[in-house]
Every structure is written in C-alpha cells, then in structure tokens.
Amino acid sequence: MSLKSLVRKVFSFLLLIPIYFYRVCISPLTPPSCRFTPTCSAYAVEAIKKHGPVKGLYLAVRRILRCHPWGGSGYDPVP
C-alpha cells in the first residue's frame, strides 16, 4: 500500500467517525427531516468512500447546504 493510499484511508476514516456518531446517537432522537434520498448522512458516507476525503467532503458540504426548506428535494445520488 502506498503512502498516498494510506493517508487517504486514514483521513476518510477520520471524516466518517462523526457521521457514524450522528447516525447512531443523534439522528434517532430527532424526527426525519432530510428532503433528499438518500439522506444527507448516507450521501456524505457514500461520497467520502467513493471520491476520497477531499472531494467527498466537498460534495457532502454542498449537499447539506442545499438541504433546507427552500431548497430542492427528491432523489439526489452521489455523482
């Protein structure tokens, strides 16, 4: 395994920890409110796993910023 690959995996893992914490500990306590399918947290996990930590985080933040009452809704897959 190259150093670049190892660094990418470590940073991806570090970004996924708070998302999994949210999904397990916080999300069950709040009513469903995501306007999109898949949910924003599922989208973030998939984006980070598919595109790596930098582009995945960028895609996840863009998605979260679109998730508001005046934004879009519906099916929005990870590109």
Swiss-Prot record:
Main localisation: membrane
Sorted alphabetically, which keywords does the UniProt record give?
Cell inner membrane, Cell membrane, Membrane
Q: Does the keyword Membrane apply?
A: yes
Pfam name, any one: YidD
Topology of this chain in the membrane: Peripheral membrane protein
Q: Which InterPro entries match?
A: Membr_insert_effic_factor_YidD
Q: Does the keyword Cell cycle apply?
A: no
Cited function: Could be involved in insertion of integral membrane proteins into the membrane.
Alphabetized PANTHER family for the sequence: MEMBRANE PROTEIN INSERTION EFFICIENCY FACTOR-RELATED
Per its record, how is this protein called by name? Answer: Putative membrane protein insertion efficiency factor
Q: Which organism is it from?
A: Bacteroides thetaiotaomicron (strain ATCC 29148 / DSM 2079 / JCM 5827 / CCUG 10774 / NCTC 10582 / VPI-5482 / E50)
Q: What is the lineage of its organism?
A: Bacteria, Pseudomonadati, Bacteroidota, Bacteroidia, Bacteroidales
